[in-house]
UniProtKB/Swiss-Prot annotation:
It holds the Pfam family Ribosomal_L30. Keywords: Ribonucleoprotein, Ribosomal protein. It comes from the Bacteria. This is Large ribosomal subunit protein uL30. InterPro entries: Ribo_uL30_ferredoxin-like_sf (IPR036919), Ribosomal_uL30_bac-type (IPR005996), Ribosomal_uL30_CS (IPR018038), Ribosomal_uL30_ferredoxin-like (IPR016082). Belongs to the universal ribosomal protein uL30 family. GO terms for biological process: translation. It comes from Streptococcus pneumoniae (strain Hungary19A-6).
């Protein structure tokens, strides 16, 4: 299955609690931290919820 790299590019400070919890659930902490996750519907939904805070790249 394909993998994606998710990078936190904007701070979740001042955002609504559900968005902050989504960032933590993705495994992101500090700015410019990144995680590599499997590309599935659940992860894509989480990315959509915080798309204004993260950038996403395909990983080979």
């Amino acid at each position: 299955m394909a993998q994606i790299k998710i990078t936190l590019t904007k701070s979740p400070i001042g955002r609504i609690p559900s968005q902050r919890k989504t960032v933590v659930a993705l495994g992101l902490g500090k700015l410019n931290s990144f995680v590599i996750k499997e590309d599935n519907a659940a992860i894509r939904g989480m990315i959509t919820a915080v798309s204004h805070l993260v950038t996403v790249e395909e990983v080979n």
